[in-house]
Amino acid sequence: LEKTVSILLLIALLFLAACKGKSAKDGPEEYSPEYQETPSTEEPAQNDSSRHSGLDLKELKAYQYNWSESDDLPPLVIVIDDFGQISGQLLEDFTALPQEVAFAILPDLPNTQAAARLADKTGHEVLIHVPMQPLGNDNPGKRYIKKGMEAADIADLLQEFYSQMPNAIAANNHMGSAATADYSVMQAVLEELHELGLFFLDSATTNKSAVPSAASALGYKTAKRDIFLDVPDNSDATLIGKIQSLGKYKGRNEPIVIITHCHTREKLNALNKFIAQISDMGLKLIPPSKLYKKLSPPA
């Protein structure tokens, strides 16, 4: 009996450990689990043959999509989140992407300023990837915008983040399902970003975002993420699904906004494949600065 109890306790502990590592979604399927926004460690260096190997687009090209080049699809904006931690060859390889692809850089990290300088040097626009309070227990960083903060404290923090990447042209939220749902917080955020001459891209980690209402009250144009490219994974099946989903934006005037992440070379390879396929299908990329010009005035 004692042995049976021990085995049952061990099974229960293993089950609890497995559950602890999981993170719940904030909303419907189109909203990302916030662990997707958690920086990971830099992957080990790989040899040159692996790094520069050709892309296998066979599966992506073979699929019969529900749209074609003749359809009236808007251009795409691609933003890569979570720069600031990775460095070395992986970072350099991300800069080899088309210049229209933008880098969203986390503040207060070892490679924050180096990533901002390298992005600027290689022609990529920079966004401040502002850490914000999530609903769950994920850690957004040492300093982040949270519910209950005074407007002056929010302004000071945003100014400090901006000083680390003064070439930034916009900002988007890192995590933030709690903070972006708070009207007073987002009003203070948008007011300060306006003072800094930056526009805001809502990463849409919650379906209860207060950004539209706060922006409307201020007469401030904002953008919203449409697609997370690397959710749930970086497989060809996922990429095909994302490309297929572009068809629902036929006839829309505003560009399609796509976010992915820089954590691993697998994500870089998937992004390269996605760009190669949609380019072959006639879609164009534009940088976030051109996105802003195409945004509709707030309602």
Predicted regions and their residues:
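Sec-dependent signal peptide recognition
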Residues: 2-10
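C-terminal motif of bacterial Sec signal peptides marking the signal peptidase cleavage site
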Residues: 15-18
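Bacterial lipoprotein signal-peptidase II cleavage site
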Residues: 20-28
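Active-site beta->alpha N-cap acidic-glycine motif
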Residues: 63-139
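Hydrophobic faces of well-ordered beta-strands that scaffold small-molecule active sites
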Residues: 76-81, 99-105, 124-130, 169-173, ...
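Catalytic beta/alpha-barrel core
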Residues: 79-83, 102-108, 150, 172-182, ...
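Alpha-helical scaffold elements lining the catalytic groove of polysaccharide deacetylases
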Residues: 141-163, 179-185, 212-250
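C-terminal domain-boundary segment and adjacent tail
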Residues: 193-206, 265-299
